Amino acid sequence: MKKKLLALLLACVMVLGLAACGGSKTEQPSSTGDSAATEEPAAPESTLHLGYDPNTGEEFYGPYYDEWSDMTDEELYEQALKEDTAINVYATSSKMLKAEEPFEEKYPGLDLIVSDLDTDEVLNKAQIENDTGNITADVLQTKDVNGSVFYEWYNQGILEPFYPRDICAHIDEGNLKYSYPLYASQAFWYYNTEAFPDGQPIDNWWQIIEKDENGNQKYRLFTKEIGQESSYMSLFASFINNADEMEKAYEDCYGEKLEYTYDPSSFNFEVPENNAGVEYLWRFSQAKMTFIGDGDELVLAVHNSTKEDPALCLASAGKIENQEESGYNIAWCVNLAPYTGLLNVESMFAVKGCNSPAGARLFIRYITGGADGQSGGLKPFTKVGNWPLRDDFEDKKNPKKLNELGAIANNLDDIYAIYPDVQDMWTYWLNQSPNK
């Protein structure tokens, strides 16, 4: 919200400044009345096709279709051979490297160059290249979990949308709203299957921080530091946006009204009172937990726990592979109330002003399955914990379908509006925790 308001204020200042310059003449207006002189200046028109325009305060959602959207693989390939044949991809997934050889075999004459980078590196390198006019990247692969890409990157002229119409026909439109998706993932709470052979010990988020009759925390908790993981911070922000659902989840679990114990007056911004999501953030920040940066070590901690000393950990869905690869006694906690988690979508972006615009779009089509879903591009990303979003692509890896796990779509608009405040609340309260 702070960022959007600042952008709008700056835009208003610019408009007022221009109006003041235009009205600086000392002559008095004609007595006959000139309607043109008294007309309000026309509202600025946006040139954006996707993203947030701070000049107009408008959001533009996908899917967006242009002349590129209807070009076939053959047409794009023919055009790609006439431009710079080196296609540079900045990716946050190392699995993207596996696409180089098969793509080049399928499209002789094109050279795919993949750089495996951190999320911040992908965006920062693209920004520096845009600012200096030395654009190397043609394609970016990353995910937007808190709305920063949608609200801050398209309007800088760094990215431009590409939605291939034939492929988008096989993807639910809700998953096309903010970007063009590669696949979806999410995080789960894990439990020890040996300690709880009858199934997951929790079915509600409030039970995670539950205390026993002696006032002791029921479960040892392991997680990455929430405030340093944007996807986790966004999840907690969603609880605040969905406070009614969080309150109902508490009442359904315990059969009584939720008592609000947090102090909203500790901050220099407005904190909603009697908000169940804020209450959960406060209580969670005061719980005893161990922060571990490595996901494999998180699930190992759960594997090593016992029924007498039970533990839960929050980790990415893909860490379930340790169940088979390492023999860990772990499983996901699914269908938690009010919802298990947020769907985080890995997305593909075309770089504006790149040297290989046709090649970039050909590769984006290829990596997301091509016209019939059988290009082979999705193969490296087909694993437990990744869910393809095409309805014509068979998911053989995951034990459950995406709609059977209790996750909800990520509402980036609402999360972006409060994300900085939620981060501040978490940091402040965590520093106050007696269990820190």
Language-model regions, residue ranges each:
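Periplasmic-binding protein-like
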Residues: 169-172, 184-188, 280-284, 327-349
